[in-house]
Each structure stands twice: as structure tokens, then as C-alpha cells.
Amino acid sequence: MAGRGGSALLALCGALAACGWLLGAEAQEPGAPAAGMRRRRRLQQEDGISFEYHRYPELREALVSVWLQCTAISRIYTVGRSFEGRELLVIELSDNPGVHEPGEPEFKYIGNMHGNEAVGRELLIFLAQYLCNEYQKGNETIVNLIHSTRIHIMPSLNPDGFEKAASQPGELKDWFVGRSNAQGIDLNRNFPDLDRIVYVNEKEGGPNNHLLKNMKKIVDQNTKLAPETKAVIHWIMDIPFVLSANLHGGDLVANYPYDETRSGSAHEYSSSPDDAIFQSLARAYSSFNPAMSDPNRPPCRKNDDDSSFVDGTTNGGAWYSVPGGMQDFNYLSSNCFEITVELSCEKFPPEETLKTYWEDNKNSLISYLEQIHRGVKGFVRDLQGNPIANATISVEGIDHDVTSAKDGDYWRLLIPGNYKLTASAPGYLAITKKVAVPYSPAAGVDFELESFSERKEEEKEELMEWWKMMSETLNF
């Protein structure tokens, strides 16, 4: 079972069926219109994709529809509940759903963190349906992705905020209504501020990764964290995610770490140790979006400052400083590299534009997903072939390490080049290997570590052999 508070698929679907909507019957919740009131239901439909806004009951229905169509490669689970009790639903697509396969990287998309930024929510619903459709058609790219990657899609991290924003009359929505969760908390300012810690560690020495290691209990006890924030923190800690994107709205740009500036100034390029690969990852998204990558595109609003934008990408701190954001939290608390993608100048654009947004972003969403198969991957084992979990894999010249998962598997995103990788673990002798990294696929580098106890036994045997040889030579 993936994710804290997750429920088994059959239990979830059983509950949904009991509510009478699994196969299309009406579902209702307080303050929401009945799903049967279809609002020009199926306004624009193409290959099973309904280009319309999905309220909470309709979102659940859409995900279950994908699962019913592609049961062999999909699973629905929840990582927790919002403040008002709505489930934070995830649909997983994999050739072995529900299972972490050793050596297979884990990917996630998260949408609708700000409830009134609605395009990402809909694009992820569309993406789930598209992946299912194309898999069944035998699309080689999609089949290979699903067979080699465990894909997790959370359309809405802030379902309460979305319902508030969507409940406003008319198509023109307020710029701020629904942005925060039901407690009034901005979720993208609510994560533990690990940037401050790593900036101190850069100067004084200290860890450069996994800065919340073994601190789940402290997270649970922190009353300043929203339930949505806590749920995602546990999700990040429970699954060995490698790559992620957080979909927002209000501009057109792919934003990469660090989001918070080192000096505390409002605008300052704040590079992470992995600045090169983050720039490449951001371009992998923006380059396939014609509007985002257009160098002649005017700013979304007259007085907007997009001077930091290059090829549809920007460093977060150079644009504006964001403390407590989810993007940097992923990078500094886990092995997961995340960017933030702003999808639209309008936060809640008219429904009839959703199909155009899908067409503009479909190839970008797939291109970004493919980036997970870059860099280096492999296993860390002992001399008997047993996996070594939590081994550290460091790259010479890059002050950010990753660690191996429970099966000893690891993934390290890198741009093409020649590198020295070192694997180390407590009680073992470290090993360094050289590797030439292509653009893709990821180069395979395995490590077999010798324990100190094995080395002592080996040295003892060597000493005994030497003593025996000397005794025979000197006849004593």
C-alpha cells in the first residue's frame, strides 16, 4: 500500500459503489451540485477525454472510469484527506500496480495545489485517460513508459479550494478565491523550510540531503502544517520518487530550484547543486509547449516582470523568492527532483479553452515523464548479493547526494558527461567508479560493498598465509 492513510483499491471502489456512483449514478456532497447535473455534460469529448471542469464527485468518477477501462495497469489510492474531508486521490499507472519493482523508478505529477489554479487539475485527469487509451492502442512510447516506470498522478492536492473557486458564479473567477485550503493556509508556503537549513549547512558543514530523515512523528505533531501538507510529506517519504512536477497557473513558465533565495532578497538567482540537470528538465517541458517557449510572447500581465525567463524556464529565486514551497522540500527531504510548471496566464480560464491547453501541454507532459530515464541507475549490494538500503551515492563535484531504496536500487539524474560516483554505507568500505553518462537511457552502475568485518577476516587470512609462507621458507 503506497502512501500514509492509503486505502486498498477494492475497498475504495467498494465504498464508491455503495454510494451509488461507480457506474455513473449520481453522487453528492455538502455544498456541491449533484454529479447528475452534468453542466452541458460531455461538452467536448474526444477518445474518452471530457474537456470540462470536474467537480469533486466528477473527478472521482473520471478516475474510476480510467481504472475500469485499464484495470491491468492502474490502481486508485488515497494519501489522506483534506481539511474538509475530501480524499486526496491518486491514480497509479504501471505494469504492476501497487508494487515497487526493484530498479523501476517512481514518478509523480501533482496538480491544483492552489485550488483556483484549475488547468493542471484537468490536464492530469486528461493525462490519465490518455495514457490508458494509448496503452490499449499499443503506442510504443506509452507502453514502454508504463512498463518501465511507476507513474502516480494526483489531480488535486487542494480539492477544498477548488470547490470554493468553482462555486463562484460565471466564468470570470476571482484571482484569490480558493487559492488556500479550507483553513486559509497557502499550501505552497506551508512545507518545512529546508532551504534555510541547507544554506547554513553549505557554510558550516552538514547534510546536503534527506534533511527530515526519521522525523515523521515531528511532522505529525506540527500544528502549523495543513492536513494536505502532512499527507504529501508522508507520501514523499514512503515512496522512492525520483522525479516530479507540480502544476500551477497564473503564468507560462517551467520553474526550477531553488525557490527561496540565499540572501533573503525578493529576486536572486539561487542555484541548487543540480542546477544543470534542473535547467535541462525544465527545458524538456517548456520546449514542447509552443506558447511557453515562444521568445516573443508578451508577459501575461502588463506589469509582470518575466526578465528571468529563458526559453520558457526560470530559476525560482530569480523570479521571486518562495519560502516553504513543495518543490524545494522534495529535493532537500528525499531523492525526488521536482519542478513547478505554470500552465496558463489565467488561473481558472473558460471551460472551452481546456482542449487547447491539453493540446499545448500533452507532448510536454510525456516529454517530462521520459526524463526519469536519464543519468545513472543501479543497485548497491553486499558481497553476498544482499541489498543495502540507505547507502549514499555521491557524485564528485555535485554537493547533493542520493540514497538507495529498500531493495538497494538507486537513481541519480544527471546531464550527459563523465562522472565519478561513490557508494558508501555505514560498516562498509566505499567504492568509487567512473561512468560516461549519455543523454538517455540511464547508464547502469552497480556497486558491491565489502563490510569492515569481511575485510578484517580477509586481512587475518592473508596474515596467516604470509606467516605460513615465511615459516616454510625459513624452516621454523
From Swiss-Prot:
The keyword Glycoprotein applies. Pfam families: CarboxypepD_reg, Peptidase_M14. Keywords: Carboxypeptidase, Cleavage on pair of basic residues, Cytoplasmic vesicle, Disease variant, Glycoprotein, Hydrolase, Hypogonadotropic hypogonadism, Intellectual disability, Membrane, Metal-binding, Metalloprotease, Obesity, Protease, Secreted, Signal, Zinc, Zymogen. Belongs to the peptidase M14 family. The active site is at 342 (proton donor/acceptor). It catalyses: Release of C-terminal arginine or lysine residues from polypeptides. It comes from the Eukaryota. Sorting receptor that directs prohormones to the regulated secretory pathway. Also acts as a prohormone processing enzyme in neuro/endocrine cells, removing dibasic residues from the C-terminal end of peptide hormone precursors after initial endoprotease cleavage. Residues 1-25 form the signal peptide. The lineage of its organism: Eukaryota, Metazoa, Chordata, Craniata, Vertebrata. It is linked to BDV syndrome: An autosomal recessive disorder characterized by obesity, intellectual disability, and hypogonadotropic hypogonadism. Additional variable features include central hypothyroidism, hypotonia, and developmental delay. Zn(2+) binds at residues 114, 117, 248. Glycans are attached at residues 139, 390. This is Carboxypeptidase E. PROSITE patterns: CARBOXYPEPT_ZN_1, CARBOXYPEPT_ZN_2, PEPTIDASE_M14. Its EC number is 3.4.17.10. One of its GO terms (biological process) is cardiac left ventricle morphogenesis. It comes from Homo sapiens (Human). The gene is CPE. It is an enzyme of class 3 (hydrolase). SMART domains: Zn_pept. GO terms for molecular function: carboxypeptidase activity; cell adhesion molecule binding; metallocarboxypeptidase activity; neurexin family protein binding; zinc ion binding. Interacts with secretogranin III/SCG3.
